[in-house]
């Protein structure tokens, strides 16, 4: 989504504004299976940094604004952080789902919450994965291990895309 360099200081005469909203839970059904890692507090939870309980629901919340000339999407994800490549994944999914919706921009933000599932791959068995990846680099054999959980990240991408589709 390229956005626009045009600055508009007045609404057009026939402008009709619309707003859409949607939200979804980012807590998977199997969250307590010992497979998900808590972001932000590795030293406090060492050596086990797995999610042990859920106090509050993690959510993605989306607002879509339309001024009659195009839609602008704002999605906020309750997570420690979200990488540029992850945002591109979400944008690609939205582009496929909503190709006829005249979306001008898709903006995705993280709340930087320190008590949620790790979306950056830093609060898991990091050194084990680092050692494995160094071995793969030097040997040229095997596959690299991602710090993030690909299954969870796809879940997050799907839920975020779903809220955008619903809000549009």
Label the predicted regions:
Residues 1-168:
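Conserved beta-alpha junction segments in alpha/beta enzyme cores
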């Amino acid at each position: 989504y390229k956005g626009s360099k045009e600055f508009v200081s007045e609404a057009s005469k026939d402008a009709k504004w619309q707003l859409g909203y949607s939200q979804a839970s980012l807590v998977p059904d199997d969250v307590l299976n010992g497979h998900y890692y808590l972001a932000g507090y590795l030293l406090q939870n060492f050596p086990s940094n797995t999610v042990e309980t859920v106090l509050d629901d993690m959510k993605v919340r989306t607002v879509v604004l339309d001024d009659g000339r195009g839609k602008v999407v704002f999605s906020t994800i309750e997570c420690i952080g979200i990488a540029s490549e992850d945002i591109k994944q979400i944008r690609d999914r939205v582009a496929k789902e909503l190709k006829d919706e005249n979306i001008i921009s898709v903006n995705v933000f993280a709340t930087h919450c320190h008590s949620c599932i790790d979306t950056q791959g830093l609060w898991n068995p990091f050194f084990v994965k680092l050692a494995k990846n160094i071995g793969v680099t030097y040997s040229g054999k095997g596959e690299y291990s991602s710090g993030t959980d690909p299954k969870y990240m796809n879940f997050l991408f799907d839920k975020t895309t779903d809220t955008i589709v619903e809000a549009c």
